[in-house]
């Protein structure tokens, strides 16, 4: 699994150079994962003119502030539902797999945080969110959507009063930490789980996600601006609860980000095809956990200045280099290194704990 990878063969088939061979994968989700990772790269090292000495960056890069990580979290939830649907052993087996992945995500997050980069690493927080949603694995799409909406709004309001309460407490601080507070961000994962239970291969579902996302984003942003909030690309003003500023964790920001995620996923489901044209992006998205981790390592090696004094040249070079590496890896080796490790570890743990005696594990996402 990347934070959200679907079914993955253990090794690359000999004909992997034909991009039509993406067995078991919903390529639109891989494209959406690629979009989320590129967005986070832009947020970390891209120049929007709002950070560093250069005020002449690409102003439109404001779209990469906060939203890509929300898309990433929604896609993670989508993967959980796809895992559950493909698990022939049962929900208990899926729960152990999700819990194992959660522990590994927390561990990888701690390692990446230890590198001391200025980047707020999402993986540890995402691991905590995985643990929190385990009881919801068998819920219906409607129940997941309602619960997700409640957590997004209710968690955002509650966060206002407990922000940073557990800072300094390893792992637990993920619940109330500023950038990705699990008490609110778990709503993204729940909504993603609802999406993952839909028939994502059907064009009508992609269309519904596009229209829901587009209209929802327009209404949410429009209402927030009408009640006095600044537009997302402007300096923050207005009431806190209507703020559209990235990582403000206001109810409007959380809901708006959710609709943006639905729009991105819907568009990617619409346009993605398993053809050579899409190979680099699909390879990039299919190993998003490995790519995300690699960019943190690169930033650690390059030094903090690559973040505090961003350059769109650095953004473009880093993105293209990682995409090229992912493409070569995918063609010759198949699943990404961290994705493969995550799949093997979670499957073995689940088979040992929850599989009926004598049952075969079969392929796992």
Predicted regions and their residues:
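Alpha-helical transmembrane segments and their immediate juxtamembrane cytosolic regions
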Residues: 2-365
């Amino acid at each position: 699994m990347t934070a959200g990878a679907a079914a993955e063969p253990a090794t690359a088939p000999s004909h992997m150079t034909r991009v039509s061979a993406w067995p078991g994968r919903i390529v639109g989700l891989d494209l959406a994962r690629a979009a989320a990772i590129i967005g986070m790269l832009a947020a970390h090292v891209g120049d929007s003119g709002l950070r560093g000495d250069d005020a002449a960056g690409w102003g439109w890069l404001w779209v990469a502030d906060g939203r890509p990580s929300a898309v990433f979290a929604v896609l993670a939830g989508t993967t959980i539902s796809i895992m559950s649907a493909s698990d022939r052993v049962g929900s208990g087996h899926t729960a152990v797999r999700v819990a194992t992945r959660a522990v590994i995500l927390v561990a990888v997050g701690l390692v990446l945080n230890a590198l001391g980069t200025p980047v707020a690493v999402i993986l540890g927080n995402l691991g905590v969110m995985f643990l929190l949603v385990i009881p919801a694995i068998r819920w219906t799409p409607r129940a997941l959507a309602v619960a997700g909406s409640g957590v997004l709004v209710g968690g955002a309001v509650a966060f206002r009063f407990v922000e940073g309460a557990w800072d300094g407490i390893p792992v637990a601080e993920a619940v109330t930490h500023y950038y990705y507070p699990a008490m609110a961000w778990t709503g993204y994962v729940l909504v993603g789980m609802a999406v993952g239970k839909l028939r994502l291969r059907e064009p009508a579902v992609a269309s519904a996600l596009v229209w829901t996302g587009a209209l929802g984003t327009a209404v949410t942003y429009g209402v927030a601006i009408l009640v006095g909030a600044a537009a997302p690309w402007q300096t923050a003003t207005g009431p806190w609860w209507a703020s559209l500023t990235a990582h403000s964790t206001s109810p409007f920001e959380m809901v708006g980000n959710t609709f943006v995620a639905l729009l991105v996923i819907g568009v990617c489901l619409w346009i993605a095809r398993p053809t050579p044209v899409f190979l680099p992006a699909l390879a990039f998205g299919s190993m998003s956990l490995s790519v995300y981790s690699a960019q943190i390592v690169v930033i650690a090696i390059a030094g903090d200045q690559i973040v505090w004094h961003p350059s769109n040249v650095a953004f473009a070079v880093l993105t293209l280099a990682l995409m090229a590496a992912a493409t070569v890896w995918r063609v010759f080796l198949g699943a990404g290194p961290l994705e493969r490790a995550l799949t093997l570890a979670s499957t073995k743990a689940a088979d040992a704990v929850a599989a009926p005696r004598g049952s075969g594990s079969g392929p796992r996402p």
